[in-house]
C-alpha cells in the first residue's frame, strides 16, 4: 500500500511542478519492482523530460500539463515583445504626409526606419511620432513656465508655498528629461540635409550648441541655494541677510526664462512642418507667432516694471508709491504695470504718469528701445507675410500700374483705355503667372498632365481631338498659347499672311466672307488652318462676337506636329476643302494634293470613316445665319459683295449712275416687294459654279480663274432670283431732271440698247432650257448681260465724286440694282458710238466665255490694263460732251440718299 502510494504522491508532486527531489533515496522493494515493470520503456525518459520542464514530445498523459505551463510562460513574453515593438515603432519615422514630403517616397521612409533600428538602443528619430508628441508637451510646458514664473517671482512674496514648489519641481523634472532626450535624438545636418543617428556625433553636437543654456534653465538653482542656506545657522537666516537671500533667489529663478530659446527652436520646427504641408496654415502659424511673441514681451516688461521697485523696497518716488499701490491686490498691480509697459513699447505715452525716479527712467527707456525694435520687426514680418500670401495679385497690380502710366504718357483716349482695362481683366483675371517659366521647370510627364488638365474642356468639345491619337492631342496641346480677344476684334483678316491657327475654348466668333452669309464658330471650333496648309493668305475674316478665349498654334509648331502624324494632316486638309466649298471658294493646292492622295491610295476604310465623322461634326458645329447688315439685299448682289472693305470705307454712298440708263427697255414688270433671300444652313458643293459672283478680294495669286457652266435657264435661276422691277411712274419719280441737251445722242443710245436686248432674247430662246426651270425664256440674266454689253478689260469709271474708282469686279459682274438707286448697273449706257461696237465686242456678245480671268485689284481700286487684249477705242467726242450734263442734276434729290453733296 505504501509502495502504491508513493507513485501517486510522486505523480501528485509532478502535477504541482516539483518533479526533482535530490535528497530522496530511490524506491526499493516489490512496489519499486512493480513500478519498473509497470512503467513503459519510455516512461523514464518521459519522466526525466518532465522533471526538466522541457517537454516537446510526450508519450501518454504525463506530458500534457508541462506544455500548458510553457504556453503560460510565453504569454507575458509575447505581450512584452508586442509592447516593445510598438514603442520602438514610435521612435521611428511614420508614414505620413510630412515624412513623405521629407524623404520622397514610402520606400525611402522604410529605409530610414531600418537606419533607426540599426543605429542603437533608444535612438529617437527627429521626425518620429514620439518626438512629435513630446515636443508638443514641451511647447505647452514652456509657454506655461514663461508666463507663470515672472508673475510668481514679481507679485508673490512667498516662494516656499506647496503649490509653487510642486509646480517648479514638476516643470524642472520635465525639462531635465528633455535634456536627457536631446542626447538620444537625431539631428539634421544643415549642409547636406542628412539626418545624423550616430550617438557619439549627436552628443558632441548638442554639447557644442545649446547644452549649457538648457542645463542652466533646467536646474533649480534657487532651491539649491535655499537648501544650502537653511543648513547654516538659523539665527543668521532670520537676520536682515535673509531678505537679500530671498531677493537673490528671485533673480536666480529668472534663469528659467532661458527656456525661451527652446520655445523659439520648437516653434521654428513647427513652422517648417506646417510650411511643408499647408501653405495657409504656415501663414497663420507665423502670424500667431508674431502676435504671441509681442504679447509675451509686453508681459515680461510689465513684470519688470513692478519687480525693480519691489527689489528696492518701493522707494517713495517710484511709480508704485506715487500711485499708492503698494498694498493693493496683485491683479491691480499687474494691470497697471502691463498698461505702463505697453504704452512704452508702442510709443504712445508713459502710462498713468511720467517716470520720476532714476530707475523708472532707465526702465522706461529700455522699454521704448525694445518696443520700437519689436514693433518694427512685427510690421516688417506682417507686411512680408501679407505680400507672400497673394503674390500673383500683387504682381498684377504692379503690372497694371505700369499700363496706366503708359496710357497716361501717350494720352490715349478714354474708350481705348477702357478697352485695355477690360482686356487685362478678362486675360489675367486679377492674377499674373509666368506660366511658361513654371511649365518649363517641370519634367515632361508632369507638364503634359498639367496641359491636358488645363485644356480638358477644349478636348471634350472638339471632335477633331476626340477622334485623334492621344499622343497627337498631347503634342498639339503642349504647343498651344492662350490668347483673349474682345468683342469686335478681328482675329484674322482676309488677305493677310497666316502665321497662326486658333482653337476656340470659349466664346462665339463670326466668319465674314464676301457672300451673303455669315457663319458662327463656337466652343470647340478651330480656324486659320488653311493658310498653314497652303502657305497662302487668309481666305476669310474672323471677328469675335463675344469675349473669346482661344489657344493659338504657330505655323512652325503646326508643321512640326503634323510631320509626325500624316493622317491628321489629311484630316485638316479634308476639313479645309469642305469649308472652302461651303463658302464658295476653291484652293488648287489642296485639291491637287487631295487628288494625289486619292490616286496613291493612302486612304483606307478606317481613315475614311474617321474623316467623314470629323467633317460631319465640323458641319454641325458651324452655324450659318443670314446677313444682318443688308436687309434688302437680293440673292447674288455682286456689286456689294465684290466691293473691297477699303472702297466701302472710302465711299459712304452708292455710286451715281446716269439718268438715261433708266430706259423703258431696261425695266421689267414690277414686283410687289423686294424680298430678302433665305440662304440654307450649309452651302451645297455646287456653289463652286457660282464662285464667280463672290470672288476673293485680296488673293495671294495674281489672277484667279473660275469656271462657268453653260448659261442655261435652270442655272440662271439658281444664280439669280427675280429682280424687283419698277413701274414707269416710279422711274419717273426717281429720275433726276437733266438739263436740256441735244436729244440725238440719247436716241441713238436707246436704239442701240433695244437692239442689244432683242439679240439677247433671241439667244436665250435658241438655247435649250432645263426641265423644271421656272425662269421664262425672255428673262435676261444680269451677269451675262453685263458680259455681253461690255468688254471684260474695260474700266468702268464711277460718276460720283466721293468714289474715285470702283473695284475691278464691277466690270465683270454687274448683276443687281442697289437698294437705294433702284436700277441695275447692267443698264448703264456704253459711252461709245454705234460705229465702234464691232470686232471684239461683237465676239464677246455672241456667247458666254467658259473661263473668266479676274485681275487682282490695285491699291487705287482700278484694274491693270490687259496685256493680251488691245484696249477699246476711245469714246467719241459727242459722248464726252454729254457726261458733264449728266452730273448736273438736282442736288436736292441726291441729299437724302448720298453722304456727299454732289
Swiss-Prot record:
GO biological process: apical protein localization; cellular response to cAMP; cellular response to interferon-beta; general adaptation syndrome, behavioral process; maternal behavior; negative regulation of action potential; neuronal action potential; positive regulation of membrane hyperpolarization
Major subcellular location class: membrane
Record's bilayer topology term: Multi-pass membrane protein
Transmembrane residue ranges: 132-153, 163-183, 205-225, 250-270, 285-307, 361-381
Annotated motif Selectivity filter, positions: 347-351
Residues of this chain annotated as glycosylated in UniProt: 327
Intramembrane segments: 334-355
Tissue: Highly expressed in cerebral cortex, cerebellum, throughout the hippocampus, in medial habenula, anterior dorsal nucleus in the thalamus, tenia tecta, several nuclei of the general motor system and in optic nerve layer. Detected in a subset of elongated cells in taste buds.
GO cellular component: apical dendrite; axon; axon terminus; basolateral plasma membrane; cell surface; dendrite; dendrite membrane; dendritic shaft
Domain of life: Eukaryota
Positions with biased composition (Pro residues): 867-877
Keyword set includes NAD: no
Regulation: Activated by cAMP, and at 10-100 times higher concentrations, also by cGMP. cAMP binding promotes tetramerization and formation of an active channel. Compared to other family members, cAMP has less stimulatory effect on HCN1 because part of the molecules already contain bound cAMP and form homotetramers when cAMP levels are low, this inherent tetramerization in HCN1 results in a weaker response to increased cAMP.
Family per similarity comment: Belongs to the potassium channel HCN family.
Complexes and interactors: Homotetramer. Heterotetramer with HCN2. The potassium channel is composed of a homo- or heterotetrameric complex of pore-forming subunits. Interacts with KCNE2. Interacts with the SH3 domain of CSK.
Name the record gives this protein: Potassium/sodium hyperpolarization-activated cyclic nucleotide-gated channel 1
Amino acid at each position: 500500500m505504501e509502495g502504491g502510494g508513493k507513485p501517486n504522491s510522486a505523480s501528485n508532486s509532478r502535477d504541482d511542478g516539483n518533479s526533482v527531489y535530490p535528497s530522496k533515496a530511490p524506491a526499493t522493494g516489490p512496489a519499486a519492482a512493480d513500478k519498473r515493470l509497470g512503467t513503459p520503456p519510455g516512461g523514464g525518459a518521459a519522466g526525466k523530460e518532465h522533471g526538466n520542464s522541457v517537454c516537446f514530445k510526450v508519450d501518454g498523459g504525463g506530458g500534457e500539463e508541462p506544455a500548458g505551463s510553457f504556453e503560460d510562460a510565453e504569454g507575458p513574453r509575447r505581450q512584452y515583445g508586442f509592447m516593445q515593438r510598438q514603442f520602438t515603432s514610435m521612435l521611428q519615422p511614420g508614414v505620413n504626409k510630412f515624412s513623405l514630403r521629407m524623404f520622397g517616397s514610402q520606400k525611402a521612409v522604410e529605409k530610414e526606419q531600418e537606419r533607426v533600428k540599426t543605429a542603437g538602443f533608444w535612438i529617437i528619430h527627429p521626425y518620429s511620432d514620439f518626438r512629435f508628441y513630446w515636443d508638443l508637451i514641451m511647447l505647452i510646458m514652456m509657454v506655461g513656465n514663461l508666463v507663470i514664473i515672472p508673475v510668481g517671482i514679481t507679485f508673490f512674496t512667498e516662494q516656499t508655498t506647496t503649490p509653487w514648489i510642486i509646480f517648479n519641481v514638476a516643470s524642472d523634472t520635465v525639462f531635465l528629461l528633455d535634456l536627457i532626450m536631446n542626447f538620444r535624438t537625431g539631428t539634421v545636418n544643415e549642409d547636406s540635409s542628412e539626418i545624423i543617428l550616430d550617438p557619439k556625433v549627436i552628443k558632441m553636437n548638442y554639447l557644442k550648441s545649446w547644452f549649457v543654456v538648457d542645463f542652466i534653465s533646467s536646474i533649480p538653482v534657487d532651491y539649491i541655494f535655499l537648501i544650502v542656506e537653511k543648513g547654516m545657522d538659523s539665527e543668521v537666516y532670520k537676520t536682515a541677510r535673509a531678505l537679500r537671500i530671498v531677493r537673490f533667489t528671485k533673480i536666480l529663478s529668472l534663469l528659467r526664462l532661458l527656456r525661451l530659446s527652446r520655445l523659439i527652436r520648437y516653434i521654428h520646427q513647427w513652422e517648417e512642418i506646417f510650411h511643408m504641408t499647408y501653405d495657409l496654415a504656415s501663414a497663420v502659424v507665423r502670424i500667431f507667432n508674431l502676435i504671441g511673441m509681442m504679447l509675451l514681451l509686453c508681459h515680461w516688461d510689465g513684470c519688470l516694471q513692478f519687480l525693480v521697485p519691489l527689489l528696492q523696497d518701493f522707494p517713495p518716488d517710484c511709480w508704485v508709491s506715487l500711485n499708492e499701490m503698494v498694498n493693493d491686490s496683485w491683479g491691480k498691480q499687474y494691470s497697471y504695470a502691463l498698461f505702463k509697459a505697453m504704452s512704452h513699447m508702442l510709443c504712445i505715452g508713459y502710462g498713468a504718469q511720467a517716470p520720476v525716479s532714476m530707475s523708472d527712467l532707465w526702465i522706461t527707456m529700455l522699454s521704448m528701445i525694445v518696443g520700437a525694435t519689436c514693433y518694427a520687426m512685427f510690421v516688417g514680418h506682417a507686411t512680408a507675410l501679407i505680400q507672400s500670401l497673394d503674390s500673383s495679385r500683387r504682381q498684377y497690380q504692379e503690372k497694371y500700374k505700369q499700363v496706366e502710366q503708359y496710357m497716361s504718357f501717350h494720352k490715349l483716349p478714354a474708350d481705348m483705355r477702357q478697352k485695355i482695362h477690360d482686356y487685362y481683366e478678362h486675360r489675367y483675371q486679377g492674377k499674373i503667372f509666368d506660366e511658361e517659366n513654371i511649365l518649363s521647370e517641370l519634367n515632361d510627364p508632369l507638364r503634359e498632365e498639367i496641359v491636358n488638365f488645363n485644356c480638358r474642356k477644349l478636348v471634350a468639345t472638339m471632335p477633331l481631338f476626340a477622334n485623334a491619337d492621344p499622343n497627337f492631342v498631347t503634342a498639339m496641346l503642349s504647343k498651344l498659347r492662350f490668347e483673349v480677344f474682345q468683342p469686335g476684334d478681328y482675329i484674322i483678316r482676309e488677305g493677310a499672311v497666316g502665321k497662326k491657327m486658333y482653337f476656340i475654348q470659349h466664346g462665339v466668333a463670326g466668319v465674314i466672307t464676301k457672300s451673303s452669309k455669315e457663319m458662327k464658330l463656337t466652343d470647340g471650333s478651330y480656324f486659320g488652318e488653311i493658310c498653314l496648309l497652303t502657305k497662302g493668305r487668309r481666305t476669310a475674316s474672323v471677328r469675335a462676337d463675344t469675349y473669346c478665349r482661344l489657344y493659338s498654334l504657330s505655323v512652325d509648331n503646326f508643321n512640326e506636329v503634323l510631320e509626325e502624324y500624316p493622317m491628321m494632316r489629311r484630316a485638316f486638309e479634308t476639313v479645309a476643302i469642305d469649308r472652302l466649298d461651303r463658302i464658295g471658294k476653291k484652293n488648287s493646292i489642296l485639291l491637287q494634293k487631295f487628288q494625289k492622295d486619292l490616286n496613291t491610295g493612302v486612304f483606307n476604310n478606317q481613315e475614311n470613316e474617321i474623316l467623314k465623322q470629323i467633317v460631319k461634326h465640323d458641319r454641325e458645329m458651324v452655324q450659318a445665319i443670314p446677313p444682318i447688315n443688308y436687309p434688302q439685299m437680293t440673292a447674288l448682289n455682286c456689286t456689294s459683295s465684290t466691293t473691297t472693305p477699303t472702297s466701302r470705307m472710302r465711299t459712304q454712298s452708292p455710286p451715281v449712275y446716269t439718268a438715261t440708263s433708266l430706259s423703258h427697255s431696261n425695266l421689267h414688270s414690277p414686283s410687289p416687294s423686294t424680298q430678302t433671300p433665305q440662304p440654307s444652313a450649309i452651302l451645297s458643293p455646287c456653289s463652286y459654279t457660282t464662285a464667280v459672283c463672290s470672288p476673293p478680294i485680296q488673293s495671294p495669286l495674281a489672277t484667279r480663274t473660275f469656271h462657268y457652266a453653260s448659261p442655261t435657264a435652270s442655272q440662271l435661276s439658281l444664280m439669280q432670283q427675280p429682280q424687283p422691277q419698277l413701274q414707269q411712274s416710279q422711274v419717273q419719280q426717281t429720275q433726276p431732271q437733266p438739263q436740256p441737251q441735244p436729244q440725238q445722242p440719247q436716241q441713238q443710245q436707246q436704239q442701240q440698247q433695244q437692239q442689244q436686248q432683242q439679240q439677247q432674247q433671241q439667244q436665250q430662246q435658241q438655247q435649250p432650257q432645263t426641265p423644271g426651270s421656272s425662269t421664262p425664256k425672255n428673262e435676261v440674266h444680269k451677269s451675262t448681260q453685263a458680259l455681253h454689253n461690255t468688254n471684260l478689260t474695260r474700266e468702268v469709271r464711277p460718276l460720283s465724286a466721293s468714289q474715285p474708282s470702283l473695284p475691278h469686279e464691277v466690270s465683270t459682274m454687274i448683276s443687281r440694282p442697289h437698294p437705294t438707286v433702284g436700277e441695275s448697273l447692267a443698264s448703264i449706257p456704253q459711252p461709245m458710238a454705234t460705229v465702234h461696237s464691232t470686232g471684239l465686242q461683237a465676239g464677246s456678245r455672241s456667247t458666254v466665255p467658259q473661263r473668266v480671268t479676274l485681275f487682282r485689284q490695285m491699291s487705287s481700286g482700278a484694274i491693270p490694263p490687259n496685256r493680251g487684249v488691245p484696249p477699246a477705242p476711245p469714246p467719241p467726242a459727242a459722248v464726252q460732251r454729254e457726261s458733264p450734263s449728266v452730273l448736273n442734276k438736282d442736288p436736292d434729290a441726291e441729299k437724302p440718299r448720298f453722304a456727299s453733296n454732289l
